[in-house]
Each structure stands twice: as C-alpha cells, then as structure tokens.
Amino acid sequence: MYKRQILIISISVISINSGFGYFLALIANVFSHYVFDQALRITKGYEKNKSQIYVDEAEKKLSTFNGPIIAITGSYSKTTTKNTISQVISTKSNVFATPESFNNRLGISKSINEDLNSSHEIAIFEMGTYGFGEIREMCSWVKPHISVITGIAPVHLERMKSLENILDAKSEIVDLTGTVIINGDDELLLNQARLWTAQKMVIDCSITSKNAAVFVDYENSIHSIYISGKFITSVEGSKILQLSIALTVGVLIALEMDIICLLYTSPSPRDRVR
C-alpha cells in the first residue's frame, strides 16, 4: 500500500505540474492501481525465479524434519497467534518459528535454511499472500500437518475484489493438511469449514460462543478456557490476546498436548497484534 500511495502521488503531481490539471490527475489515480498490479506481476516472476534455489534447499531440509509442522494465515492476528502458540509450546518443546515479516516464499525458505536445526521439535510458519496460488505453492514444500486461519477481513480488497476471493486464497493453506484450526466467530470462514469436515479434523475456536469446540471468555484480565462447553482452566493476559489464546488451545488439542500444564507454566504472551 505504501508503494502504491507513492506511485499515485507521483503521477498526480506530474499531471498537475504539466498543466493538464485535475482531470489527468484523476485518471492517473485510477490507472495507477492497474500499473501497480502489473508491476507486481512482473516482479513476482523475477522473485520466484531468484528464490527457487533457496526454496529447493529449504524443501530438502524440511524433508528430514520429523516434528509437527504448523502453518498460520489470515487477514489479521497472524503474528500474534504465531507468537502465542510458540511461547506456550516452548515451555515443553524446542520450537522453530519464522521471524516477524518472514511470511513469503523467500522469507520462509531463508529462515529454514539459516535457523532450523535438528534440535527443533515443532515448526511454526506464518504465511501471507497477495493473490491466488501463493499459499498453495508454499504449502507444497512446507507440508503443514496443522493449519490455522485467524479470520477473513477486507485487506487487499482492491486487488482481491471480494471477501470470497480473500477466503479462497487463504483457504489454500488447508489443501494438504490434516487438521484445521479456525476462528469460529468468522461466519464466512465457518461456512467454508463445513466443506472440510468430511476429510479433515476441524476445530472451531470462539471468543463469543460456548457452543464452539474451544471457547475463551474474558473478564478482568482473566481468560477462562472452555473445551466442548466444559471449563478447563484460566490464564492471565490482555483482551487483545483472547482470539490468539483460543486458537492456541485449538492447536494444543490437535497436538494432543497437556493444555492445563502448558498454560500454567507459560508466561503471559506479549501484547501485540499483527
């Protein structure tokens, strides 16, 4: 978005300074979106070719990794959820998690090649996308066992055109996985998830409904955790972590880990939303 704004402003200034006035500035603003998207398509091909050697190396390295692989996507709270999952599981296991902003094929492959080692027991990958096929391609060599979708929102709507398209692009993370953890308060996502239940384990995590597989209630800095309607335990933390905690519990269920023990021994996650 930042690059696009620069492009729009630059073209508009040129139009006005050249004496063509408001009309050409308006036309420039409209067509700059098209020019920007075309530029992205061109650079995307270049980036893909340039990064293939790193992807091949990362895929080979991952092929020898025997632990569970978790992939996370969504329109919001990806980094917060990744950090929360990593922090909770790290109390009992050695966790590899991609660094902040390393969520495309080059960033993910680079972090694998440089930082993943034989001592790691669980790997967590955050995945972003600007269009169709990107997450599917990353999953083809990351091969996640558990996929997490934090929610769908009108981010990059000018490029993706509709929420349904955003949902389809994010849902590519489900194709090769066996278990899916979703934000059960997102109606669009929840409806889509009903199509997955025949072939995959789907765990819906909610901050509003006790009918969900996982429900996290918040009051006075306390998150009360319910599984299948039954109170399990509670943890301290700010309200902005409520969804991330719910999704983390969903992941712990999928991993068949001791939820009470892990949450009890884990320090409060960082209060950060991404």
Q: What do the PLM-derived regions correspond to, one by one?
A:
Residues 149-266, 270:
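Acidic, Mg2+-coordinating active-site environments of NTP-dependent enzymes
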Residues 1-5, 264-273:
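Conserved small/polar residues in nucleotide/adenosyl-binding loops
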